[in-house]
Amino acid sequence: MAKFKIKDGVAIIPEKTTEIGTEAFKNSRTLVEATIPSAVTTIEASAFEGCKKLKSITIVGAVTKIGANAFAGCEMLESIVMPDSITEIEENAFNGCCKLTSITLPASLTKIGAAAFADCNKIEEVTIPASVTEIGAKAFAITGWNSRLTKVVLPDGLTTIGDEAFDSCRNLAEIAIPATVTSIGESAFSGCSSLTSVTIPNSVTSIGFYAFYYCTSLTSVTIP
């Protein structure tokens, strides 16, 4: 596995690098900024996990996968630029990035893994790209009641909303469930206490236990 250097808080990654390996920068105490060069195709598991001073990541070019826990616990991460080459964001990839205020998910993305953006409590809006068919369990779930998420746009083509996908997003006021969704997982919208109305499309064949539990403002539910 390649070893990388950090100079003045910036990751030094050679242009010919093709992979940021498992735990490459894990728990670095000095890393503040990183640019992933265009030859890199994969950011492996825990590559930047626990880099508590990391503020900015720019991913250039050909990366297709962001591995499990890749940026988990990067508490100071404020921004990330992702290219349209990314198809998969694996579980816990950005879990606990509590300073991340906005994300632009690439149009190439097909899967958002379990807890990928869990406890990213400062994100206010999310638009899920049309290519995504599955939102993993706890993908945007919040521990506690401090979520700022107010708007989520779900695409036509989405089939699965995982267990606890938006659990405790207390400021989420509305959600439009596309007519392609077949499964709404257990506690998928539990604790979304600002949600006022929900329309379940004809395509849905399964609604899990507690899917809308503690949605205390919910006054209208339309079920086919």
Regions found by a protein language model. Give the residues of each.
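Structural signature of tandem-repeat unit edges
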Residues: 2-19, 29-42, 52-65, 75-88, ...
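Short regulatory "switch" loops immediately downstream of catalytic or recognition motifs
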Residues: 140-144
